[in-house]
Amino acid sequence: MKKYNVCIVGGGSTYTLGFLKSFARMQEEFPLNKLVLFDIDGERQKPIGQYGDIMFSERYPELDFSYTTDPAEAYQDMDFIFMQMREHIPLAHGKIGQETCGAGGMAYGLRSCVDMIEAIHQIRQYSPEAWILNYSNPAAIVAEALRREFPDDKKILNICDQPENVVRSTSRLLGYDWEDLDPVYFGLNHYGWFTHIYDKNTGELMWGMI
């Protein structure tokens, strides 16, 4: 099986720890040759990188793991690039800091879109065929900006698991198996509605979930 080269942009995020553990756990299903963390804030990224050094030396010693603040080093010859950028504006002004809707979402989107577009232009210089998995919020706004800027790039995937998480938690509270549900979701990723929820087995509308 091919071993992949992967870069995580925003390596200083605490969410990166979950990715590192997942890569170590799934090395048989998704084997890696190289894993690089990239962040513009080297000090913030350093403890995450040190954690990776220790964990991979014990659980994945053959992995080529590193962390850097140099985009040329981070983006070179990658197969997959995970994007996780976060900007902070509203909280500094005493406003709601929700990152996908309202004033926070709009401000976040205006900043994230610019940085995302710049990052992807850089990535394509070094890894033109890499799959880019973006989960920077506000996901819907960033996805639309990337679609307009890179209309022919079919290897940019925009991901959010919030709707699925809502279905999982709600079904558990109400005593249903979420895998038996067929939901219809409308709206932004953190600001939407389930207009219908059907039973996959019968096709009937599940009034108990509404």
Q: What would you call each of these model-derived segments?
A:
Residues 30-53:
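NAD(P)-binding Rossmann-fold cofactor-contacting core
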Residues 2-4, 9-12, 44-45, 142-157:
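Conserved N-terminal glycine/acidic-rich loop preference
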Residues 25-28, 53-58, 125, 144-156, ...:
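Short, surface-exposed basic-aromatic patches at helix termini and helix-loop junctions that form
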Residues 152-155, 159-210:
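Substrate/ligand-engaging "lid" and interaction regions
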Residues 82-83, 132-136, 157-159, 185:
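A structural signal for short, well-ordered beta-strand segments and their strand-loop junctions
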Residues 38-44, 62-129, 134:
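Rossmann-like NAD(P)-binding element
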Residues 12-15, 42-43, 131-142, 162-164:
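Gly/Ser/Thr-rich loops at beta-strand to alpha-helix junctions
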Residues 5-35:
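N-terminal Rossmann-like dinucleotide-binding module
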